[in-house]
């Protein structure tokens, strides 16, 4: 793939981060206006150097925060738990300023009856233009600590850019340094846009964290302390993907995240009632989080059927990721070798049938598909595909869903998206170094569709693809013309 200029990459992000809308459920994907403003800002200020592999960088340059967090004085606090410290990075965004969802989740945390004598629930709240409750200000970021009487403010700072990796790493270092415990975990709360778009929207600074920025923040905190987090959870949409897992794997043991969009109410924080005077392993906590999320969703749907939405939440073993990536890389090497204009129609047909995510509640096609369903449909009983599926299944500790063919973890395989989004996906994969044979396969797949030369210099004629759906929703090779 040719080297792209920084200007080109900014343009790609500016185009792809636009067509997302919120539904009546106030889903946690990122809204149109905020992304458009973010990318307008990024286009004016991005000066990030190219990545070392020569394919540029796909992230936005963050506007500097004011300063890293200074040291705190917590002598006035009665107790500090020593069993678990759970840090919540609460980027309020429009979810708070328009709907008060962040304040509602703080209420849920207080109501959970947490054992605060042994556990620290530490919140860094900011990123909203205004707060509906709790006396918080959009001009400030506030550190909150949960006590037996509720949240108390520990420190307050001028508004920090929560889309800057320095802000996240500073908060994590703050938690490590001043709230020591036997186990640490992190919740990332806000909008999510999958691996291409990233996580979080700071309304005040018009910024978000892309995956490379998230990696930077974790490296400068978790990596610097050489203490793995027990788990990282995304109370955000579309973040349960292998690409996200590849970023988190060096820094945590488990990930809890959703393949699909989340309703505006997000997680049910009643799971915090399970905290005790003993460390709860990440896989066990993952089950608590998944079950409480699914149970609450079904409860809401029973009383308010008009709010029904697709639900997914999974607990992923990050220590099993390396074997899964290797197996996937082997399979896509095999698939790419056999890819030509003759078998392309079968791939198109099966890609169109794979369970995808994010399209239910938005006008944007994120290209996120279920990995296991993809391998089932395109694998064609290949031993390599079966080995890859087994390795991926080994990563999925626990999952809950009300959808068919939602196995627990996704991969980004853009299909009926525009070229700009596809280019940004490829750029992201190169930047992360994720499964190189998968990236190569995608480039060859798109080359056939565009009538270009394959990476292996296989010439094909110009091709146009037309897929029609039969009345029963099935696809047939005769439905696909080249």
Regions found by a protein language model. Give the residues of each.
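Bacterial N-terminal signal peptides that target proteins for export
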Residues: 2-13
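Bacterial N-terminal signal peptides
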Residues: 14-21
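N-terminal extension/subdomain marker
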Residues: 34-180, 482
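Terminal, contiguous helix-loop blocks that mediate binding/assembly
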Residues: 40-79, 194-195, 199-482
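Structural recognition of the beta-strand scaffold that forms the well-ordered cores
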Residues: 85-90, 120-125, 184-188, 230-234, ...
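Residue-level signal for short, function-critical loop segments
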Residues: 92-93, 127, 190-192, 415-417
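Catalytic-core segments of thiol-dependent peptidases
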Residues: 125-226, 236-237, 242-243, 259-260
């Amino acid at each position: 793939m040719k080297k792209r200029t920084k200007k080109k990459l900014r343009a790609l992000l500016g185009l792809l981060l636009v067509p997302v809308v919120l539904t009546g459920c106030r889903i946690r994907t990122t809204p149109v206006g905020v992304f458009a403003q973010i990318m307008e800002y990024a286009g004016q200020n991005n000066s990030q150097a190219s990545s070392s592999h020569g394919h540029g960088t796909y992230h936005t340059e963050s506007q500097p925060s004011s300063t890293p967090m200074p040291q705190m004085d917590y002598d006035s606090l009665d107790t500090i738990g020593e069993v678990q410290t759970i840090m919540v990075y609460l980027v309020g965004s429009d979810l708070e300023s328009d709907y008060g969802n962040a304040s509602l989740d703080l209420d849920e945390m207080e109501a959970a009856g947490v054992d605060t004598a042994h556990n620290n629930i530490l919140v860094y709240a900011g990123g909203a233009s205004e707060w509906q409750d709790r006396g918080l200000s959009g001009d400030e970021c506030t550190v909150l600590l949960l006590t037996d009487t509720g949240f108390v403010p520990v420190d307050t700072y001028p508004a920090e850019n929560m889309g800057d990796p320095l802000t996240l790493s500073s908060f994590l270092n703050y938690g490590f340094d001043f709230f020591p415990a036997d186990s640490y975990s992190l919740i990332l709360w806000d909008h999510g846009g999958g691996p291409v778009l990233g996580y979080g929207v700071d309304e005040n600074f018009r910024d978000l964290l892309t995956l490379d920025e998230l990696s930077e923040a974790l490296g400068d905190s978790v990596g610097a302390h050489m203490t793995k987090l027990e788990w990282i959870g995304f109370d955000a949409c579309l973040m349960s993907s292998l690409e996200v897992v590849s970023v988190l794997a060096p820094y945590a043991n488990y990930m809890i995240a959703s393949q699909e969009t989340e309703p505006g109410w997000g997680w049910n924080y009643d799971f915090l009632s399970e905290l005790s005077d003993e460390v709860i392993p990440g896989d066990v906590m993952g089950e608590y989080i998944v079950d409480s999320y699914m149970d609450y969703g079904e409860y809401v749907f029973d009383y308010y059927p008009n709010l029904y939405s697709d639900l997914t939440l999974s607990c992923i073993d990050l220590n099993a990721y390396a074997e899964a990536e290797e197996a996937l890389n082997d399979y896509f090497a095999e698939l790419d070798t056999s890819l030509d204009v003759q078998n392309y129609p079968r791939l198109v047909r099966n890609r169109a049938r794979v369970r995808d995510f994010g399209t239910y509640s938005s006008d944007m096609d994120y290209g996120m598909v279920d990995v296991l369903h993809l391998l089932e449909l395109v694998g064609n009983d290949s031993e390599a595909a079966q080995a890859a599926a087994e390795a991926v299944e080994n990563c999925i500790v626990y999952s809950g869903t009300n959808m068919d063919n939602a196995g627990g973890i996704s991969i980004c395989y853009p299909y009926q998206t525009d070229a700009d989004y596809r280019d940004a996906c490829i750029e992201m994969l190169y930047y992360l170094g994720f499964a190189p044979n998968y990236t190569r396969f995608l480039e060859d797949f798109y080359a056939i569709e565009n009538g270009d030369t394959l990476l292996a210099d296989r010439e094909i004629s110009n091709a146009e693809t037309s897929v029609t759906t039969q009345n029963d929703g099935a696809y047939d090779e005769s439905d696909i013309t080249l």
